[in-house]
Curated annotation (Swiss-Prot):
Hydrolase is among the record's keywords: no
Name of the coding gene: MT-CYB
Lineage: Eukaryota, Metazoa, Chordata, Craniata, Vertebrata
Summary of the function given for this chain in its UniProt record: Component of the ubiquinol-cytochrome c reductase complex (complex III or cytochrome b-c1 complex) that is part of the mitochondrial respiratory chain. The b-c1 complex mediates electron transfer from ubiquinol to cytochrome c. Contributes to the generation of a proton gradient across the mitochondrial membrane that is then used for ATP synthesis.
Ligand binding (a ubiquinone): H201
Organism name: Sturnira erythromos (Hairy yellow-shouldered bat)
Superkingdom: Eukaryota
Name used for this protein in its record: Cytochrome b
């Protein structure tokens, strides 16, 4: 008798995606992050759902409702900090996942890659709107500063900002709509994840060598399910340690002060996972130029497949490209650090240099290095 998982219409889909899926035998731990992101999304949706049961999206009560969750709701503090720090884990996994794709040439699967970039934008939008909900000082001023950037768009900018705000400033209408979108977007993200996996399973997974692995495949279960479970345990241990020992490590103390439109915090900055983009935004003196650079810092990923000049797919056997890749990582760390610093000398010039380097590496140096490597190998 044929196993039910191979005949049942619904179980058949799950089976072909998670059990009998042929996977390359050489996948390293860098391929764990896709499943880790799935776990992060699940944790965020569950904790978010329970938080939404107690949260009120009204400017008069939002801050107090978050305090109420932490003090009066059973394990409310745990839910709140799991959700806040879960977002940080989400972005750590997300950036490592994208980095893996860049290093091993996974971007040559253009449909999967482009849906991935769309997912990145959706998750960033969700995180931004979620940061506004506790209605602390940094929530309010972060929302004001970031939404105000849209006013740089010629002709329609000012009207667009007021349309998003639902008034002439960030107020009750803004908070209510941000809560609505913050609740809705994760489910759109979950749907996009399904499309992402659909495209991935059309082509099959890439592997560290970048060489087609059709003759050497193994079933996903039990080999990679066990490997993924180990990844889950490591990540959940790290998340638990963060939540239970230093839950506010990655947050901003200003967000424990209720939002006050009359009092601006000394340093307005987003959460750590947006600091690299924020540093790029601040490094350009012109408002519209800064906004364009901010958007392009992520959108640049869409043209990476076009700029792939190497005859090899992966960077595994390309030492010159590897050096550039790790330089790019160093530049991103530098930008993240600069984004959290005040706008003064020498941080301004460091930020500008790092921003120029970021675009230079991706647009010019990497393609040139690939061409050089092709010539060195007489290809």
């Amino acid at each position: 008798m044929t196993n039910i998982r191979k005949t049942h219409p619904l179980l058949k889909i799950i089976n072909n995606s998670l059990v009998d899926l042929p996977a390359p035998s050489s996948l390293s731990s860098w391929w764990n992050f896709g499943s880790l992101l799935g776990v992060c999304l699940g944790v965020q949706i569950l904790t978010g759902l329970f938080l939404a049961m107690h949260y009120t999206s009204d400017t008069a009560t939002a801050f107090n409702s978050v305090t109420h969750i932490c003090r009066d709701v059973n394990y409310g503090w745990l839910l709140r900090y799991l959700h806040a720090n879960g977002a940080s884990m989400f972005f750590i996994c997300l950036y490592l996942h994208v980095g893996r794709g860049l290093y091993y040439g996974s971007y040559t699967y253009s449909e999967t890659w482009n849906i991935g970039i769309l997912l990145l934008f959706a998750v960033m939008a969700t995180a931004f709107m979620g940061y506004v909900l506790p209605w602390g000082q940094m929530s309010f001023w972060g929302a004001t500063v970031i939404t105000n950037l849209l006013s740089a768009i010629p002709y329609i900018g000012t009207e667009l900002v007021q349309w998003i705000w639902g008034g002439f400033s960030v107020d009750k209408a803004t908070l209510t709509r941000f809560f609505a979108f913050h609740f809705l977007l994760p489910f759109i993200v979950a749907a996009l994840v399904m499309v992402h996996l659909l495209f991935l399973h059309e082509t099959g997974s890439n592997n560290p060598t970048g060489i087609p692995s059709d003759p050497d495949m193994i079933p996903f279960h039990p080999y990679y399910t066990i490997k993924d479970i180990l990844g889950f345990l490591v990540m959940l241990t790290a998340l638990s340690a963060l939540v239970l020992f230093s839950p506010d490590l990655l947050g901003d103390p200003d967000n424990y002060i209720p939002a006050n439109p009359l009092n601006t915090p000394p340093h307005i900055k987003p959460e750590w996972y947006f600091l690299f983009a924020y540093a790029i935004l601040r490094s350009i003196p012109n408002k519209l130029g800064g906004v364009l650079a901010l958007v392009l810092s992520i959108l640049i990923l869409t043209i990476v497949p076009i700029l792939h000049m190497s005859k090899q797919r992966s960077m595994m056997f390309r030492p010159l490209s590897q050096c550039l890749f790790w330089l790019l990582v160093a530049v991103l760390f530098t930008l993240t650090w600069i984004g959290g610093q005040p706008v003064e000398h020498p941080y301004i010039i460091i930020g500008q240099t790092a921003s120029v380097l970021y675009f230079l590496i991706l647009l010019v140096l990497m393609p040139l290095t690939s061409i050089t490597e092709n010539h060195l190998l007489k290809w």
